[in-house]
């Protein structure tokens, strides 16, 4: 093969990767959930920015256990992180408070898309999906994610539980 043919192939690959790279870049992650999970507040602030509100509280699990907690609101209240025992263990993402494309996410169809926006595998099979909730369990580094709809079948909010001991 001559050098002109090689250059044409290389240029073709560069154009191909440039086009696909640009389409992926147009849909950035909301944030990488695995980089927030179990992390202390200073690490979370590097990803989500400074909190707009911080409240000392008590977290009550569904099993009746209580833990001293700090609740921090990020991104103008769209993301609430509950810090238990020093780490981000429980998150609530108010999808309808996020800007742009997130407000148009429909339930249940776009629940998988939202997983990808959180840096997780969009092809993960849900453990449960019905009119009230879509649930994924035992994702790498994350115990449970629950997506809840509005009455208009949009995604309303997401609960993320990092470790089952806080369930």
What kind of feature is each model-predicted range?
Residues 77-133:
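Long, charged/polar, surface-exposed segments that mediate recognition or autoinhibition
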Residues 136-157:
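Short, exposed beta-strand-loop hairpins at the edges of beta-sheets
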Residues 1-10:
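Bacterial N-terminal signal peptides that target proteins for export
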Residues 29-73, 78:
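N-terminal secretory signal peptides
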Residues 57-64, 126-134:
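Short linear loop/turn motifs
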Residues 165-167:
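Short, solvent-exposed mixed-charge patches
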Residues 11-18:
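Bacterial N-terminal signal peptides
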Residues 20-27:
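Sec/Tat signal peptide C-region and signal peptidase I cleavage site
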């Amino acid at each position: 093969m001559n050098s002109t043919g090689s250059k044409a192939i290389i240029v073709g690959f560069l154009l191909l990767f440039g086009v696909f790279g640009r389409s992926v870049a147009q849909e950035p992650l909301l944030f990488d959930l695995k980089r927030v999970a179990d992390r202390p507040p200073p690490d979370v602030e590097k990803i989500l920015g400074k909190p707009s509100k911080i409240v000392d509280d008590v977290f009550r699990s569904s099993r009746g256990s209580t833990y001293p907690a700090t609740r921090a609101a990020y991104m103008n209240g769209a993301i609430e992180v509950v810090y238990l025992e020093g780490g981000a263990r429980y998150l609530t993402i108010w999808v309808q408070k996020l800007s742009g494309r997130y407000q148009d996410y429909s339930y249940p169809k776009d629940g998988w898309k939202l997983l990808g926006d959180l840096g997780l595998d969009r092809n993960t099979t849900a453990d449960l999906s019905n009119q009230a909730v879509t649930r994924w369990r035992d994702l790498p580094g994350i115990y449970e994610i629950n997506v809840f709809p509005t009455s208009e079948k949009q995604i309303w909010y997401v609960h993320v539980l990092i470790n089952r001991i806080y369930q």
